[in-house]
Amino acid sequence: MLKFTAEHEWLELDGDVATVGITTYAVEQLGDLVFVELPEVGKSFSKNDDAATVESVKAASEVYCPLDGEITAVNDAIVADPSLINSDPQGAGWFFKLKLKNRADADGLLDEAAYKELIA
């Protein structure tokens, strides 16, 4: 199930694990990404904590943790090649996997239709 935040993160939910990245809209606003800093595996975050950083030719931006949980994996490929985020932000450009503290919290996030309305 795909969910979104008002801060332009996407989550692909699989049970109690969410794969997290930034949306195509966010990438279009940032421009070409040149640097990514990811969180440590095993680190716990609360909703809206700064979890990662992206830098583009235009600006630096925080990527927020969309829900309470623990980082179980990070995408090292985007650290080596940040352009993967530009070319496939909602696929190969994922940032981290988050084991959710409470799966039901995801119900409060935006669905795709609501997110598209937000960015329209």
From Swiss-Prot:
The UniProt record lists the keyword Membrane: no
Q: Does the keyword Transferase apply?
A: no
Q: Which GO terms describe its cellular component?
A: cytoplasm; glycine cleavage complex
- Which SUPFAM superfamilies does its entry note? Single hybrid motif
> Which HAMAP family does the record cross-reference, listed alphabetically?
GcvH
User: What role is this protein assigned?
Assistant: The glycine cleavage system catalyzes the degradation of glycine. The H protein shuttles the methylamine group of glycine from the P protein to the T protein.
The protein's name:
Glycine cleavage system H protein
At the highest ranks, the source species' classification is: Bacteria, Pseudomonadati, Pseudomonadota, Alphaproteobacteria, Hyphomicrobiales
